[in-house]
Design a protein with these regions (language model features):
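Residue-level signature of mid-helix packing/kink "hotspots" within the transmembrane helices
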Residues: 42, 70-78, 150-151, 262-270, ...
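Cytoplasmic helix-loop-helix junction between adjacent transmembrane helices
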Residues: 109-145
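Flexible cytoplasmic inter-helical loops of multi-pass small-molecule transporters
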Residues: 185-208, 395
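C-terminal transmembrane helical hairpin of 12-TM major facilitator-type secondary transporters
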Residues: 276-325
């Protein structure tokens, strides 16, 4: 159902005739902070096999660990985003990272989730502020840091944690401290930008589509996020167990396969935003979610070699969707950048946590292989993209 309406950016009465420049230094810094934040979180996922063997955990219990910190982040992110839309808080970035640091020291995963709930909406806002109008590119730079950080977790677990014990997780407090320093510098820039814009007349918010169409479009985007992150939960939480049980791999070798998948996710993120800027976000979303379906359907029946190849392809294609989905949603709801970012990051985290818990329950009562056979059909929900308003906007 192609529609001529398209999301447009905010229109203002006092629009500047000079095009803003992209602040690549700020984008690089916020991407580095995202890398450090998500590396810490992925490290928790990566040591699951060690925790399972030491504490005799079931898959359901492992899923509940994921749900604990993901749910804390999921519930708080939209609230944080909504509040900071009304009352910008530049210094919330390093403060949020302090929660993550505390959670790592105390092994309190809910605190790690709380820190993430503050970090993601405000960091996404900073990326948009620094974009110079190249919103897809800016979101991709921001996202690739997080995805590359996520890929480092299994690698570091294989090299440092598995051989020398889980007590070495404490060393990664240094990563949180570095992130706090970087975020403090970003907060200074954010504060300066806020002061510069304070005296300027506020732009008039023009909603690009009727309310009912916006609600429909956002609902479809959230369903697509559900399909993406439920599937991602099957890989991030249980891929190592799948490889160990089906193919007899060691923990270290299984972690290296997980690293390859997550590295492909990071690479795919780079593509989604800039391509969406050029050809339209809807087409990137369509190709990313639905386009991965043939590979997910084949995966449960593949040999070890082809399992590695297919998961890399799946990670690369699937990852290109999120930047396009987020910017598309921000264009649907101009003036609500923080709330939209919080809603979509929070929903993504929530679906990841819920997916881990539900899939863990299925694995306990059936088998880990059945989990991948069920999840293989999730990308078919990408067919709903046809009902999105046709977005021909190019930055």
């Amino acid at each position: 159902m192609a529609m001529s309406e398209q999301p447009q950016p905010v229109a203002g009465a006092a629009a500047s005739t000079t095009k803003a420049r992209t602040s690549f230094g700020i984008l690089g810094a916020i991407s580095l902070s995202h890398l450090l934040n998500d590396m810490i979180q992925s490290l928790i996922l990566a040591i699951y096999p060690l925790l399972q063997s030491e504490f005799s955990l079931t898959f359901m219990q492992i899923g509940m660990i994921t749900l604990t910190f993901q749910l804390a982040s999921s519930l708080l992110q939209p609230v944080v985003g909504y509040w900071t839309d009304k009352y910008p808080m530049p210094w919330s970035l390093p403060i949020g990272m302090c929660f993550t640091l505390s959670g790592l020291v105390l092994l309190a995963l809910a605190l790690v989730g709380t820190g993430s709930s503050v970090f993601h909406p405000e960091s996404s806002r900073v990326a948009r502020m620094a974009s110079g109008g190249r919103h897809g590119l800016a979101q991709s730079i921001f996202q690739v840091g997080g995805n590359f950080g996520s890929s480092l977790g299994p690698l570091l677990a294989a090299v440092i944690i598995a051989p020398y014990g889980k007590g070495n997780v404490a060393w990664f407090v240094l990563a949180a401290l570095l992130a706090i320093v970087v975020l403090a510098q970003i907060s200074r820039w954010y504060s300066a930008q806020h002061r510069m814009n304070k005296g300027k007349p506020k732009a008039t918010i023009i909603n690009p589509l009727p309310r009912n169409k916006v609600v429909l479009a956002v609902s479809i985007l959230l369903i697509l996020i559900f399909s993406k992150y439920f599937y991602m939960a099957s890989i991030s939480s249980y891929y190592t167990f799948y490889l160990m049980q089906k193919f007899g791999l060691s923990i270290q070798n299984a972690q290296l396969h997980l690293f390859a998948f997550l590295f492909a996710v990071a690479a795919g993120t780079v593509i989604g935003g800039p391509v969406g800027d050029k050809i339209g976000r809807k087409y990137v979303i369509w190709g990313s979610i639905l386009g991965v379906a043939p590979f997910t359907l084949i995966l449960p029946y593949a040999s070890l070699h082809w399992t590695g190849v297919l998961t890399v392809i799946i990670g690369f294609i699937l990852a290109s969707a999120f930047s396009a989905i987020l910017v598309y949603a921000q264009e649907l709801l101009p003036g609500r950048i923080g709330m939209v970012s919080g809603l979509f990051f929070g929903f993504a985290f929530g679906m990841g946590g819920l997916g881990a818990a539900v899939l863990g329950l299925i694995a306990d009562h059936t088998s880990i292989e059945l989990v991948y056979k069920i999840c293989a059909f999730l990308p078919l929900l990408g067919m709903l993209t046809i009902f999105l308003p046709d977005n021909r906007h190019k930055d």
